[in-house]
């Protein structure tokens, strides 16, 4: 998800940039501090340090707070995923390096993807290659691709692409038409495979903040 390269959920980044939050893929090696199911939605919470707190409840809601330390990523969504309109609402506050995104994976090809709705002082496009842009849900999203070499993934250590759509007009709340992004990526030579999980993720790296998000 973030990166030095963050987690099984989540919001993520580019491992080649040491200042970036750890990629969600890297965090997947860690033991989950907590996960829960409710409201028919998948839930995941990962952290590599103790100064975090996560809870989730009915109706696709989750709360996360974190203090300065390591990497944390948490969120709610679907497993398996599908192209769908993802609606979310709530509050999100970030001090430092954080992301709020729709985050997920596909298999064959193995792809880690992010539709970034908001971020803190680190733009995840740093170090990635720009491929184009797409207009969706009231904003232009800039599209990037990056590569992780021999990094942890949902299929173990692998080399895989990361796809990014980064919203220009940051927001907290709204509808994300994921199918528009998936189609745009494919049209730019960025194929997707079989959908694994997809969540609305909050991710933080050596930062502090809080999130109270409801996903539907």
Curated annotation (Swiss-Prot):
Record-given protein name: Endo-1,4-beta-xylanase 1
Function: Endo-1,4-beta-xylanase involved in the hydrolysis of xylan, a major structural heterogeneous polysaccharide found in plant biomass representing the second most abundant polysaccharide in the biosphere, after cellulose.
Gene Ontology MF terms: endo-1,4-beta-xylanase activity
Enzyme class: hydrolase
Native species: Claviceps purpurea
Source organism superkingdom: Eukaryota
Pathway(s) the chain acts in: Glycan degradation; xylan degradation
Expression induction or repression: Expressed throughout the entire infection process during in infection of rye tissue.
EC code: 3.2.1.8
A GO term from the CC aspect: extracellular region
Annotated GH11 domain residues: 29-216
Keyword Hydrolase: yes
Family assignment from sequence similarity: Belongs to the glycosyl hydrolase 11 (cellulase G) family.
PROSITE patterns (alphabetical): GH11_1, GH11_3
